[in-house]
């Protein structure tokens, strides 16, 4: 895997950054850059990560985020950095 962009959206509460960064650390996914913002009661976060040391396949990581999204009541998505940039280019 190359660098990836993770987006997190959900209702604001204590511990969101911890919950997401814990998942990343447990899977040897390194945070390269992180940005977060509150919009009213909604929390948004974009994280650029290095997945080169992660032993799981891309699909396994996507499945993990899908599972954790349900548990944490968050929308957590991961995209390849190049695809993310192409989709958000003006």
Swiss-Prot record:
It comes from the Bacteria. It holds the Pfam family ACT_6. Residues 5-83 form the ACT domain. InterPro entries: ACT-like_dom_sf, ACT_dom, UPF0237/GcvR_regulator, UPF0237_ACT. Signal peptide: none annotated. One of its GO terms (biological process) is DNA-templated transcription. One of its GO terms (cellular component) is cytosol. Belongs to the UPF0237 family. This is UPF0237 protein NMB1653. It comes from Neisseria meningitidis serogroup B (strain ATCC BAA-335 / MC58). The lineage of its organism: Bacteria, Pseudomonadati, Pseudomonadota, Betaproteobacteria, Neisseriales.
């Amino acid at each position: 895997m190359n660098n990836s962009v993770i987006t997190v959206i959900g209702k604001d509460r204590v511990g969101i950054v911890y919950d997401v960064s814990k998942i990343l650390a447990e899977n040897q996914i390194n945070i390269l850059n992180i940005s977060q913002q509150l919009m009213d009661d909604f929390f948004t976060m974009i994280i650029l990560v290095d997945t080169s040391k992660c032993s799981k396949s891309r699909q396994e990581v996507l499945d993990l985020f899908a599972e954790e999204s349900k548990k944490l009541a968050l929308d957590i998505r991961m995209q390849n950095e190049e695809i993310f940039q192409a989709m958000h280019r003006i």
